Curated annotation (Swiss-Prot):
One of its GO terms (molecular function) is (3R)-hydroxyacyl-[acyl-carrier-protein] dehydratase activity. Its main location: cytoplasm. One of its GO terms (biological process) is unsaturated fatty acid biosynthetic process. It is found in: Cytoplasm. Keywords: Cytoplasm, Fatty acid biosynthesis, Fatty acid metabolism, Isomerase, Lipid biosynthesis, Lipid metabolism, Lyase. Necessary for the introduction of cis unsaturation into fatty acids. Catalyzes the dehydration of (3R)-3-hydroxydecanoyl-ACP to E-(2)-decenoyl-ACP and then its isomerization to Z-(3)-decenoyl-ACP. Can catalyze the dehydratase reaction for beta-hydroxyacyl-ACPs with saturated chain lengths up to 16:0, being most active on intermediate chain length. Pathway: Lipid metabolism; fatty acid biosynthesis. InterPro entries: FabA, FabA_FabZ, HotDog_dom_sf. Belongs to the thioester dehydratase family. FabA subfamily. This is 3-hydroxydecanoyl-[acyl-carrier-protein] dehydratase.
Amino acid sequence: MTTRQSSFSYEEILTCGRGEMFGSGNAQLPLPPMLMFNRITEISETGGPHDKGFVRAEFDITPDLWFFPCHFMGDPVMPGCLGLDAMWQLTGFFLGWLGEPGKGRALSTGEVKFTGMVTPKTKLVEYGIDFKRVMRGRLVLGIADGWMKADGEVIYKATDLRVGLFQEKAD
């Protein structure tokens, strides 16, 4: 069994955003400002509630982040869709980290609940992705549940996050 890297720094994550980590045509993260985490603190193909693998990541919050001035003027909060996108980003990263081929695309989620906010006063956002299943067929499909914490309190939950890896068809 191959031992895979179990954590990633910001600089290493950026190599994934540039398409250098998993090879051309394979899973790729967005680059800043759409990259919604600074580091992956732990990633494993086993463990988690379903023993199918998990990812843990962190995002340092500072008052000068790009979304605060425009969402909303005078009442700054991080858009909820960015936290959800981070969960999809991490789900796709996991599939690439497993060595699965193809370009990642968010497909759907079951249920999403927002019970709190990220404001300029927040210091740290943490993400957890707990895999339920990885299906390998015409495409690779990852299905996971996710959560997001702001300064230690769970404020977002998402069930059945789905990300697919798609390979380009040969002409």
